[in-house]
UniProtKB/Swiss-Prot annotation:
One of its GO terms (cellular component) is mitochondrial matrix. It is found in: Mitochondrion matrix. Its EC number is 2.3.1.35, 2.3.1.1. The record marks 207-208 as: Cleavage. This is Arginine biosynthesis bifunctional protein ArgJ, mitochondrial. It catalyses: N(2)-acetyl-L-ornithine + L-glutamate = N-acetyl-L-glutamate + L-ornithine; L-glutamate + acetyl-CoA = N-acetyl-L-glutamate + CoA + H(+). Heterodimer of an alpha and a beta chain. Signal peptide: none annotated. The lineage of its organism: Eukaryota, Fungi, Dikarya, Ascomycota, Saccharomycotina.
Amino acid sequence: MNNLKLARFFATISKESKYVPNSGSYPLGYKVGAIHCGVKKNSTLDLAVLVSETPASAAAVFTTNKFKAAPVQVSRQILNDKNGKGISSIVVNSGNANAVTGKGGIEDALKMVDTVDSTLKNAPSSTLVMSTGVIGQRLPIDNILKGIPVALKDVGSSHEDWLRCAQGIMTTDTFPKLVSKSFEIDGRKYSLAGLAKGAGMICPNMATLLGFFVTDAPVTPGALSKILTYATDRSFNCISVDGDMSTNDTICAMANGAAGGEEISETSSQFSKIQDEITLFAQQLAQLVVRDGEGATKFITINVQDAQSYADAKKVASSIANSALFKTAMYGKDANWGRILCAVGYADADVNVLKTNVSFIPADGSAELKLLVNGEPEKVDEERASEILELEDLEIRISLGTGGGQEANFWTCDLSHEYVTINGDYRS
C-alpha cells in the first residue's frame, strides 16, 4: 500500500468514526437491504433495495445534464405516468451508471423495475430505479436480475439493514451516508431516514449523487413534490465538490403514511412545518456528501449575506464554491481572499463594491478574522489566518452590502492532489 492509499485508509477510518451513526430512528413501514451481485469487480455491496410495506407518495428531482442516464429516464416516466402515487420500492445498482447506453440501457432499467415488481407482486411500474458508476458501459444485467430476488428476501428494518443499504450505493465514497431523525407535528411523532452517495462530480443542479429519503408521514404527492423541490434547492443544489455535472443524479422522496394522522397537502396547516423539517434534514444529508468529497481535507460553508434576493446570494456563493483557484488555495491553507473577491465579482448578481465585507469564521468559536471591510482590505494577521486554515471546518462570510437583507448558504470542500489520483485511477 503506497503512502497516498495508506493516508486515505486512515482518513476513511476517521470519517467513519465521526459521521457514520451507531443507531437511528427509522420511519415505520419500510424495509431495506443490499447484496453483492457482481456489478463491481470486487466483492463490495453493489445492489440496494428499499421497500415500502404500503404504496407511497413519491417525488424526485433529476439531473439537468442533457445526456440523462437510462434509469433517470425510466424513473421520471414512471412518476409522470402515476402522478407520484403508488410507488412501493426503489432499486439501485452501484459500479455502473447505465448512462449513454442506448435503447439497450433503457431495456435494462425497465427489466430491473419489472423484476422488483414481479418479485414483490407489486402493481406494474411501482418501482423507481437508479444507477451510479462508470458511464458508457452496459450493465451486467443478468447478474442484477438474479440478484434482485436475493436482495429482496434479505430486507429488514434494523439499523444494520439501513447501513448496508447505504453501503450498497457507494462508489468512490469513503463512508456510507445515512441520517435519520424523529419529529412531531401536532403531537404526533413522525420519522425520516435518508441515504446518499456521491464523492465527486458534485455541483449545483444535481451532480453525481444519488439520494433518497423516506418518511412515515402522510404527505400527498403534490405536497411532497413541492417540498422536495424547495428542500433540494437549499441542500443538494447548494453543494459542490468539483463542479462536474453527472448524467445520473436523482434525489427521491417517499411518504407512506404508516405513522397515521391527517393527510398533509399543500394547503394544510402542517405543510410549512414538515417542509422545514425535510429541508433541514436534506441539508444535513447533503453536507455529508461534501465531507466525503474526493480527496477533500476541508469542509467549507460559504455564507453570503445582504443580497438583493436569495437567488443573487446563491449565485455568489456558488461562484466561490466552484472556483478552482479558491478551492486549491484552501487546500494549500493560503488566506488568499483576492480569489474569493474575484469569484464574487464575476457572479451575475448585484454587489455594492464599496460596502462588501469578507471574513473567515473559525470553527472553534473564536473571533472572526476580517479580510475586507466596506471594500477596503484589512491588515491580516497571517499567523492567525494559518491557524484558522488548519481547522477541518471553515465558514467564509461575505456581505454584498446591497441593503437587500437576503442570504444563502453553500457547502463545498478543497481540491487536493488526491482528487487527481482518485479520478485518474477510477476505471482501474
